[in-house]
Amino acid sequence: MPAAPRSTPASASASACAALRAALLDAPPVTVNSVPDLGRAVFVGSGDSLASGLIATEFGHRALSAGDVTWSQTLPAACDTLVGISHSGTSGATVRALRMARDAGLKTVAITSQASSPLADTADEVRLVPTLRVEEEVPCAGHVMLAQGVAAVCGVDTTPFNQALAQSLDGVRATVDAHVRDLPGSAPAAVSVLSLPELCSGADFWVLKLIEACGLAVRTVPLEESGHVDYFIGPQAHLTLQLMGPHGRSRFDRLAEALRTTGQTVCQVDTRHLTDPSAPDAAVLRDLATAVAGTWFAHGAALRWGRPPFRGGAVNMDARHIKLDS
């Protein structure tokens, strides 16, 4: 029997695009019947869920790693409401953080897809998000829905988001394919992801997906800090990804020029038109589309560089070390 044809970056993004579009159009929208009075809220999660929580910073709230609360045994200062985010509802640090907040008399909210879960059982209020029925080699579907749940809790009408995001995916794919084609033929030693706060959630998600897909050391860097610190990286091969939104273009360009003089490869990803900039809550939609782009970019880069996602199963994937054990 002939071997199955090897997937290419373009074929992988085409398959992922079709699958995610179908799942989005088939899923019910994320809705919130009533927006909770959050006061001064802190959103906590881990991994993809923390990236989802960063959406809340656009609305004046804070987002922290759930482990920073749980393992320091210290609740955030000036916090009225703790919002726990976990798709499964079983992430150990997130459940424990919510329990700490509940026991201290704070208001607690859970954002999850699982109504019968330890996280949901702990919260005063539960905001359920639908699960997208889609198979993914490098996942983003959970984040797409949890991030909508975060936005909805913050008062955004997310009812049209699935449709709007589905309509944007061809443009997202075209952007990704163009940038993957321009990547160096071999993997860098490490990667920096630069952004302004308007894309902090999407940038964080790019970091997560590049680590999962490519197995490289990847970090997120505030734009201005790249000129103060990243300027000294080298002489080893280094890839700098600039995620650009509506603001700061001239500063991105100047810093890109400076970083290139040190031998770095700089890739500028313009996210302004990944979604309709005139749509209601366009900034949140753009951040979601940026996260999807990062997922497909990471998978494409892994294929280009011959690096199997999740180290090809060479590490234990049962995730027991992050689940609730009591």
Enumerate the predicted regions with their spans.
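Cofactor-pocket helix-loop regions in the catalytic cores of large enzyme subunits
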Residues: D26, R173-S186
